[in-house]
From Swiss-Prot:
Releases the supercoiling and torsional tension of DNA, which is introduced during the DNA replication and transcription, by transiently cleaving and rejoining one strand of the DNA duplex. Introduces a single-strand break via transesterification at a target site in duplex DNA. The scissile phosphodiester is attacked by the catalytic tyrosine of the enzyme, resulting in the formation of a DNA-(5'-phosphotyrosyl)-enzyme intermediate and the expulsion of a 3'-OH DNA strand. The free DNA strand then undergoes passage around the unbroken strand, thus removing DNA supercoils. InterPro entries: Topo_IA, Topo_IA_2, Topo_IA_AS, Topo_IA_cen, Topo_IA_cen_sub1, Topo_IA_cen_sub2, Topo_IA_cen_sub3, Topo_IA_core_domain. Keywords: DNA-binding, Isomerase, Magnesium, Metal-binding, Topoisomerase, Zinc, Zinc-finger. Disulfide bonds: none annotated. The keyword Secreted does not apply. Residues 130-556 form the Topo IA-type catalytic domain. The record marks H31, R140, R141, D144, W156, R295, R488 as: Interaction with DNA. One of its GO terms (molecular function) is zinc ion binding. Coiled coil: none annotated. HAMAP family: Topoisom_1_prok. The gene is topA. A zinc finger (C4-type) spans 592-619. This is DNA topoisomerase 1.
Length: 1212
């Protein structure tokens, strides 16, 4: 039996299928050991010897390999064919050697693609380990350790908020910071262009002025509006004819197949993938045997692969799309190693594979590789110059025509944007056939103003390209370097562009000031050259390390001796031109804008650097590092914005794929009736036939929190009013929304007949009448609701029984009027004041609403001629409702009857009442608007437990802590809204059909799907992760047997070296109150500004040392608290007195809670629990019988209460 060892289980499964029964294939699951994070792991004084430590979570993997080796005849190391793969094989070999398990026959095989042919060929041609590659790995690992382990402790002690520094990551961060400084220092320059729209042979085109008054125009030649208008005038008045036509053929060649770098760039541009996501997908495709090895600098393809590609092109297209000779490519990137093929599909006949993001990436790789062997595209580029009669002014137009598409039929490479590239979109226009002497029609001439733009911020694609161009890092490390910058919160992503955070800018400034050489682009690229020389056997790895360490060590010792205050002062001077720029107005840029006497300076704080006034604490003016002149006071809440009014009850919001805020429970315009114009008469809401009248978003006439009636009637707000007050009906949140009044018992009016007095609406009021069928009043027309798409303008509505009443609204569309009627002819008198029921209960009654705009007045007549109905202006764009009730008991009419002896008295009373009502309505509306704004306000605050975000005010406010990896000063409304929306639903799992939830807990961000959890690396990943990445994360967690809850907390997150105090391993654990470190005897919680991922061994030792020095007083306090508790339980006679004193105890608990709600992200819960316990026990001792019958659980509760009550309280 032969044992084959590879890195991953997927690769092992594929290879085992090809090799057959004579082989056993096991996976090491990546690296098996590394340098421990402790002093002495690399010893420069002993030839840079290294001490390795096995990963604790790989113990069972190693055990499986060791057991299998014992039963095998030979060992075949088949890890990846690069520096890291060679290192993994070397580590396995060294480990087996130390345990004396190494078999006699050890071979190394490599293959660029996991296909049957490649694997069997590799097995037939084994080799030995490549010592040059191993030495290059050792040199790189030692360099990273020496830089990181030496610089990071300096940062922790001298630079608040800094987490780590690295040989490559710090240089990549400098690129981002330098670009940001370019943007900030950029001064836009105005320039103008003059263009003319022309036409010939019915084909339009645009020409640009390139020569004016005999001078050739450059981009910035026309600098102001005056010049532009003069040039525009000359073009308008000139007669232009074609003076020159130049046509030349152009060929475009395809790009070579992907390297690691170009794959990351193109996947970011075309697919929007992060570099790390691209590499995870490519790794999976490689292990499944679908593509070749994905970590490569090479652009060449194997001859057999080229032949397969040319065959596929011929089959899919025709012979004209295949070049005469196969295309050969050579890499142009700096520090490239062409040991491996380019990234290509293993089978060109397969144009689709896998699913989701895997399929999208595979298709991109397949198209690029196939197009690289296709024929060139043939184009014809034409340039036409048009000159006016003076010969001084020249217009130019450029166009091109594709004669043969060639490879463009299949693939065209994307390009990064260029802010100042105005010609990028030119040159592709279709031009008419123009000859010398032709005079195209001049249609319009325009002068356009422009401003030069700063260079764009780096995207992942452009940052990778820049790193590749400068020779910084290796293509295989680009993704991990960028991910570290994001995980450390040194950069943030905004619209897929990198912006340096305050911590990132401060770290870069520190390194530039004190370690400028080691973060220079040339020095870093030079180190990469040295590593390549080691890989090729042309340099000694120990000499390279010695040359580096000889200068680096003294520099770090020099900086370590300086005090933090001196470091901050140096940075203050170094950053002065940026932090306090001189505006040239004679004003001191360091003068405090708040007190005007203090001077601003750079200070260090818990969350990093900031600008503060020298008069602190008298003046509390501060501003963020790089924030500008608008400072803040951290003691005051900072308003970030307002939530939309139609967010759901909890303030949770939904987000689009681009991160835009979407109301969680909004329906479409067709569903709600809300149009762009603002108002529709009706809105249908979810429920069993429920409908509600919908007006403006700023003043809903119904309570969205109240459930609608399940019988199909609108849920209404019933208000009972007395005297001459107006009774509310319909869909109203208060009595001012829809007011209806009726006067009854007017004898003078009844003798002469019905007098319908309608208080007219403000705009275009029509008239509506309602009559019975008893002949007492004629029916007039009514603009009825358009039901089922009906557009009838007039409708006569009658009541067969002669009894009209009000009910619930209909749900017809665009209804201006809705009539409320009863089938049984009875009036629901529940809302009628008691003193008027006798005069109105036996009468037929109806009322109508008259809105302010585009609605109708309504008058009502009845057979008894005793009721005078008034239509009162409602102030809303809602008409009258047409709905029938099934029974009188379901009717929701509100009728207020006002007895009077004269019509004039009624009119005066109504006018006075309307004035008062209008004023009170305005006050109430203003109050409601103010309360609504407070409830929707999103603020950033700082409380006892740190910074947090709050939505609303008071005890009902929603709060969420600012995550540890987010700088509180950088939280804007968009980020705050997304944090408040957590946890969020990502989508249904394609296998289980269960919802995947992304949230954050005591252990940080996580994914949850049907009780299965997966960790997320950062808040950014929590907010941005999509369904495909979430499924991959959950699968990886299941594969790694990740556990959650109590089980997870029992296993260490990270194991450091042995403690110098206890000589036991120092471990990072998950505890009940969050992550902590332990050395077996002392436990120390992590500070809030330290993430578990960034914690190093030195930090852990410092935390444990500080915790061990702290006095232990908690146990003494607990013992003292138990003594009065015992006395109180035995003193039964004092129980009645407790009832009087305990009324004050809940008050203190309430006060604590209120303080927590207003000032802290996490309300204090323990005082509330004590208050409940005291109230319970205070009542029970009052009755002796109750005390005797009390079970043991109540006695325990009484004991707990007595413990919480001081002795002097009982005495009172």
């Amino acid at each position: 039996m032969k044992l084959v060892v590879v890195e991953s289980p997927a690769k092992a499964k594929t290879i085992e299928k090809y090799l057959g029964s004579g082989y056993q294939v096991l996976a090491s699951y990546g690296h098996i050991r590394d340098l421990p994070s402790k002093d002495g792991s690399v010893n420069p004084d002993n030839g840079f010897s290294m001490v390795w430590q096995n990963y604790p979570d790989k113990a069972h993997r190693l055990k499986a390999i060791e057991d299998a080796v014992k039963e095998s005849d030979s060992l075949i190391l088949a890890t990846d064919p690069d520096r890291e793969g060679e290192a993994i094989s070397w580590h396995i070999l060294e480990l087996l050697k130390t345990k004396k398990l190494l078999p006699d026959d050890v071979e190394r095989v490599t293959f660029n693609a996991i296909t049957k042919a490649a694997v069997t060929d590799a097995m037939a041609h084994p080799r030995q380990l490549d010592n040059d590659l191993i030495n290059a790995y050792l040199a790189r690992r030692a360099l990273d350790y020496l830089v990181g382990f030496t610089l990071s402790p300096i940062l922790w002690r001298k630079l608040p908020g800094a987490k780590s520094a690295g040989r490559v990551q710090s240089v990549a961060l400098r690129l981002v910071v330098d670009r940001e400084q370019e943007i900030e220092g950029f001064k836009p320059q105005e320039y103008w262009s003059v263009e003319a729209d022309m036409e010939a042979d019915s084909i339009g085109f645009t020409s640009r002025l390139i020569q004016w008054r005999g001078q050739k125009l450059e981009k910035l030649s026309i600098a102001d509006k005056t010049q532009a208008e003069a040039a525009q005038s000359d073009v308008e008045s000139g007669h232009f004819t074609v003076s020159n036509v130049e046509t030349k053929p152009v060929s475009r060649n395809p790009q070579p197949p992907f390297t690691t770098s170009t794959l990351q760039q193109e996947a970011a541009r075309k697919l929007g993938f992060a570099a790390s996501h691209t590499m995870r997908l490519a790794q999976s495709l490689y292990e499944e045997g679908l593509i070749t090895y994905m970590r490569t600098d090479g652009v060449q393809m194997d001859e057999s692969a080229i032949a397969a590609a040319r065959k596929t092109i011929t089959q899919r297209y025709d012979g004209g799309y295949v070049p005469d000779k196969p295309r050969q490519y050579q890499v142009k990137a700096k520090n490239a190693q062409e040991a491996h093929e380019a990234i290509r599909p293993t089978d060109f006949s397969r144009d689709k594979a896998a699913s989701g993001d895997h399929a999208r990436l595979y298709e991109l790789i397949w198209k690029r590789a196939l197009a690289s062997q296709m024929a060139s595209a043939k184009l014809e580029r034409t340039t036409v110059d048009l000159t006016d009669g003076t010969g001084q002014n020249v217009l130019r137009v450029t166009g091109q025509v594709v004669l043969f598409s060639g490879f463009l039929t299949l693939y065209e490479e994307s390009a990064d944007d260029n802010a100042n590239d105005r010609d990028g979109k030119e040159g592709r226009a279709r031009l008419p056939l123009l000859r010398a002497g032709d005079a195209p029609l001049k249609k319009e001439v325009r002068a356009d103003q422009h401003f030069t733009q700063p260079p764009p911020r780096y995207s992942e694609a452009s940052l990778v390209k820049k790193m590749e161009d400068l020779g910084i890092g290796r293509p295989s490390t680009y993704a991990s370097v960028i991910q570290v910058l994001k995980d450390r919160a040194y950069v943030t992503l905004e619209r897929n562009r990198f912006i340096p955070s305050e911590a990132g800018r401060l770290l870069t400034a520190f390194l530039e000031r004190f370690f400028e050489r080691y973060v220079s682009y040339d020095f870093t690229a030079g180190l990469e050259d040295s590593l390549d020389e080691i890989s090729g056997g042309r340099a000694d790895w120990q000499k390279v390390l010695d040359a580096f360490w000889h200068d680096f060590k003294p520099k770090t010792a020099e900086v370590m001796e300086q005090q933090p205050s001196a470091i901050t002062a140096e940075l203050d001077k170094f950053l002065e031109p940026w932090l306090f720029p001189d505006k040239g107005d004679g004003h001191d840029p360091r003068e405090c804008p708040s007190c005007h006497t203090g001077r601003l300076a750079l200070k260090g704080g818990r969350f990093g650097a900031f600008i503060a006034c020298s008069n602190y604490p008298e003046c509390k003016y501060t501003r963020g590092f790089g924030q500008g002149e608008d400072g803040v006071d951290d003691n005051e809440p900072v308003l970030l914005g307002y939530m939309p009014e139609n967010s759901d009850d909890d303030g949770y919001m939904a987000f689009s794929d681009q991160g835009d805020i979407l109301p969680a429970n909004t329906a479409s315009a067709s569903e709600t009736g809300v149009t762009d114009g603002g108002i529709a008469a009706n809105a249908a809401f979810s429920g069993k036939g429920n409908s509600a009248s919908h007006t403006d978003r700023d003043d809903l006439p119904f309570d969205p929190d109240e459930p609608a009636s399940s019988t199909g009637n609108v849920a209404s707000s019933q208000s009972r009013m007395t005297g001459d007050e107006t009774a509310s009906s319909g869909n109203s949140r208060d009595s001012s929304a829809h007011g209806v009044s009726t006067t009854a018992g007017i004898d003078a009016e009844s003798q002469a007949g019905i007098s319908n007095q309608a208080l007219a609406g403000k705009n275009n009021a029509g008239r509506t009448a309602v009559s019975d069928n008893k002949g007492n009043n004629s029916s007039s027309t009514i603009a009825a609701a358009r039901k089922g798409g009906s557009t009838d303008d007039n409708a006569t509505v009658s009541d067969p029984d002669g009894d009209i009443g009000s009910g619930a609204s209909s749900s017809g569309q665009d209804a201006d009027n809705r009539l409320l009627s009863h089938r049984n002819g009875d009036i629901d008198s529940r809302a009628i004041p008691a003193d008027h029921k006798d005069s109105s209960s036996d009468q037929n009654a109806s009322h109508a609403l008259s809105p302010d705009r585009n609605s109708d007045d309504a008058s009502v007549s009845n057979s008894d001629k005793k009721i005078d109905s008034k239509a009162v202006s409602t102030g809303h764009d809602v008409g009258n409702a047409i709905t029938s009730d099934n029974s009188p008991s379901d009717n929701v009419a509100h009728l207020a009857s006002t007895p009077s002896s004269a019509t004039s008295s009624v009119k005066v009373a109504l006018e006075t009442e309307n004035n008062d009502t209008a004023a009170s309505k305005a006050d109430e509306q203003a109050k409601e608007e103010e309360e609504s704004r407070k409830a929707r306000a999103v603020t950033r605050r700082t409380g006892r437990f740190g910074p947090y975000i709050q939505l609303g005010e008071g005890k009902n406010a929603k709060r969420v802590s600012v995550p540890r990896d987010v700088n509180p000063r950088e939280v804007d409304f968009s980020l705050a809204s997304r944090l408040l929306a957590l946890p969020r639903e990502i989508g249904l799992h394609p296998e289980s059909g269960k919802m995947i939830i992304a949230g954050t807990g005591r252990y940080g961000p996580y994914l949850n799907c049907d009780g299965k959890y997966a960790r997320l690396s950062s808040t950014e990943e929590l907010l941005d992760i999509d369904i495909d990445r979430a499924v991959v994360k959950l699968a990886e967690a299941a594969q790694n047997k990740g556990r959650t809850g109590a089980t997870l907390s029992r296993e260490p997150l990270k194991v450091f070296g042995d403690s110098p105090v206890t000589e036991k391993p120092v471990q990072l654990m998950n505890g009940r109150y969050g992550p902590y470190v332990t050395d077996g005897e002392t436990n120390a919680s992590l500070p809030k500004d330290t993430t578990p991922e960034s914690l190093t061994f030195e930090e852990a030792l410092a935390l444990l040392e500080a915790r061990a020095k702290m006095p232990k007083k908690k146990k003494t306090k607990k013992a003292a608290a138990k003594k009065p508790a015992a006395k109180k339980t035995t003193t039964k006679k004092a129980a009645p007195k407790k009832a009087t004193t305990k009324t004050a105890t809940p008050k203190s608990a309430t006060t604590d809670n209120a303080t927590s709600e207003d000032g802290d992200a996490t309300p204090a819960k323990s005082p509330a629990k004590k208050a409940v316990a005291k109230k319970t026990t205070a009542k029970k001792p009052a009755s002796k019988s109750a005390t005797k019958k009390a079970p043991s659980s109540k006695t325990t509760a009484a004991k707990k209460t007595s413990k919480a009550t001081p002795k002097d309280e009982v005495a009172e």
